[in-house]
């Protein structure tokens, strides 16, 4: 599926392609004091004396760490805060248990945008040594959240419509385009709606892994973004074949993962005489997974394609990590029939945007909380161990346009 291209002298995109945002009004001392006083009053009314309340600012939400005078009363603090009317007075209220305190998250009166430029320019991303670094946004203390997709190794993104799922995908893709050369990374984009990923067809000559197709360059570019279940089934099946072929190459080279294989290949270039080649990472991005898996009554071929899509995704999630193949799924239908037990087992890293109910939140995260989010990129990021509340980085349509045009203009 991979296109061999000459990337000698390839230049990664620069930060000048991304917008600089004018800093917005920050959280005022008066707002902080008002919210601290409200928390203190609720606890005092429940006969819990507070030693300290420490605000940790975030771009959209602030975490207020509550330290009761008697540490034995932490559980009572949580109950009081959960049963209080804070959720009626303030937006985005979520109560969390911390190591040394109880935290209460409250939305700021005025949200700050998190520009993609600012997170890509942060030392945590620029100095990252991980294989597939992703700067997804900022959390409390305005710390940039960077994770390694190679270790994820797959990612489920879910939530109600227009809450930030597409923005998260754009942030992930931008992070990877700013850190990996075409020889190191390929994408597969599956877009049943046919509108979310069309801008990425400009990456065809450099970053897209596609099935061989007859036709003009225009026809090839048009088919580079997969738009229906039948084509998705074919591409995902081809990825499974690629995965098995890669396992054969690793076995022949006597290694057990893609990083070791590529290091050995660099040292022993003559391996190409035995069928060996440098293996780029492959990231399959699948938008609105539910649209690809809905069974269509009376259409056997469509039902077969639906089943094939699901089976291939599970296989890739189960075995793809070692050979550098990773899957990102999104859905706006977080029901148990879509996010099945098999999906959850094989996608331990999950992002939830605002959901319409506590049930939907639990379907995604095995925990409530996503129903409390305030939308517009406010997310809960679960890495399989702990949960972080993050404001997603924003990369606008015009910025994506500039990035893809820049890459399209590079030498093949």
Task: Describe every region a protein language model picked out.
Residues 1, 6-13, 50, 63-65, ...:
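P-loop NTPase catalytic phosphate-binding loop
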Residues 1-52, 274-276, 406-412:
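Charged, low-hydrophobicity low-complexity segments
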Residues 25-36, 74-77, 81, 400:
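Generic alpha-helical secondary structure
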Residues 29, 33, 67-68, 347:
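Surface-exposed, low-hydrophobicity interaction/linker segments
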Residues 57, 78-89:
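AAA+ P-loop ATPase mechanoenzymes
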Residues 58-62:
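Short, conserved phosphate-binding/catalytic loop or strand-edge motifs used
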Residues 72, 109-116:
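Short, charged/polar, Gly/Pro-enriched secondary-structure boundary elements
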Residues 265-271:
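Conserved RecA-like ASCE ATPase "motif II neighborhood" in helicase/translocase motors
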């Amino acid at each position: 599926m991979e296109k061999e291209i000459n990337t000698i002298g390839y230049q990664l995109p620069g930060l000048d392609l991304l917008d600089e945002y004018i800093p917005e009004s920050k959280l005022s001392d008066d707002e902080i004091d008002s919210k601290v006083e409200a928390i203190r009053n609720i606890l005092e009314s429940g006969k819990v004396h507070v030693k300290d309340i420490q605000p940790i600012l975030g771009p959209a939400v602030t975490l207020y760490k509550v330290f009761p005078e008697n540490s034995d009363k932490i559980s009572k603090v949580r109950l009081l805060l959960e049963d209080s009317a804070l959720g009626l007075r303030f937006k985005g209220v979520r109560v969390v248990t911390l190591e040394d305190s109880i935290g209460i998250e409250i939305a700021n009166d005025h949200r700050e945008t998190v520009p993609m430029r600012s997170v890509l320019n942060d030392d945590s991303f620029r100095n990252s040594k991980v294989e597939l670094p992703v700067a997804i946004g900022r959390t409390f203390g305005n710390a940039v959240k960077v994770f390694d997709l190679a270790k994820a190794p797959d990612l489920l993104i879910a939530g109600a419509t227009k809450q930030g799922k597409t923005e998260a995908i754009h942030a992930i893709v931008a992070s990877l385009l700013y850190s990996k050369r075409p020889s190191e990374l390929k994408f597969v984009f599956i877009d049943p709606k046919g509108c979310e990923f069309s801008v990425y067809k400009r990456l065809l000559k450099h970053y897209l892994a596609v099935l061989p197709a007859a036709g003009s360059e225009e026809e090839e570019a048009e088919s580079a973004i997969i738009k229906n279940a039948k084509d998705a089934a074919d591409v995902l099946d081809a990825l499974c074949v690629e995965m098995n072929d890669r396992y054969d190459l690793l076995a022949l080279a006597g290694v057990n993962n893609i990083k070791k294989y590529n290091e050995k290949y660099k040292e022993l270039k003559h391996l190409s005489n035995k069928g060996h080649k440098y293996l780029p990472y492959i990231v399959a991005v699948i938008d609105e997974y539910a649209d690809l898996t809905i069974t269509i009554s009376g259409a056997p071929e469509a039902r077969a394609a639906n089943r094939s899509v699901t089976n291939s995704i599970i296989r890739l999630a189960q075995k793809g990590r070692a050979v550098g193949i990773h899957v990102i799924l999104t859905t706006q239908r977080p029901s148990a029939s879509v996010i099945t037990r098999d999906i959850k087992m094989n996608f331990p890293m999950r992002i939830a945007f605002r959901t319409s109910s506590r049930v939907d939140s639990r379907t995604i995260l095995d925990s409530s909380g996503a129903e409390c989010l305030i939308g517009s990129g406010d997310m809960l990021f679960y890495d399989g161990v702990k949960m972080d509340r993050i404001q997603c980085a924003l990369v606008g349509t015009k910025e994506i346009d500039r990035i893809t045009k820049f890459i399209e203009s590079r030498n093949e």
